[in-house]
Amino acid sequence: MKKICFLTLMLITAFGLNVNAQKLTYGAHVGVNFSGYQGGDGYHLYDEKVRTGYEIGGNIGYKLGYNFILLTGLNFSQSGGRFSTMSPYISETGSQTTEFKEVNTKVLSFEIPLKIGYEFNIGHNFSIIPNAGMFARYAIASIKSNVITADDRTQKWKCTDDFNDESHHIDAFKKFDYGFVGGVDMIFSGHYSLSADYKHGLKKIQPQFGMKSWSANISVGYRF
């Protein structure tokens, strides 16, 4: 995080940001997201699935000059994923067996993005803003998470806590996550927006299986 703060300070210094002198824009958005996990131990993980969730948030923009914009805000989202795992032990026949038929996660989180965008004015009432940067996210609650064991027992579980069932164990998912974000905003009539972005976590949010988060988001909004 120190590196992120340092890079942010460098960007602000480089563009000569003067909050009092620059035009401030703000707005709100609501949309849908598709999320899951990538990476991980290929010997233990299989059948990764995408989860559908939502995102609502407020947006703040500072016009830096030369069409560059510093974009931030605060988002509230529901995201998660689904996967299956193989047992770390070898069966009597010498083959691997399933340990968890399904591991389902779903969390509610607050997120702060920090991005730099460039506004292309295509016409009098239309502009496109490609943007890229980083995000920080913190999970405040685990909801509707559960585990289906190899013997078809479904057990409720808070994925931000450890799961233990006799000799079966799943480490807790980390509450804090951060990573890269890139996307594009389309502004219509100076106020209405249609946005899409992709987020990829840099932190191993589940150390036991070495997984990182990802999500794709589509939203509509209004810019004041």
Please report, for each region that a protein language model flagged, where it lies by residue:
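Transmembrane beta-strands of outer-membrane beta-barrel pores
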Residues: 32-36, 76-80, 108-111, 120, ...
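Repeated loop/turn-to-beta-strand initiation elements of outer-membrane beta-barrel proteins
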Residues: 24, 67-70, 126, 190-196
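Outer-membrane beta-barrel strand-turn architecture
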Residues: 62-66, 120-122, 188-190, 224
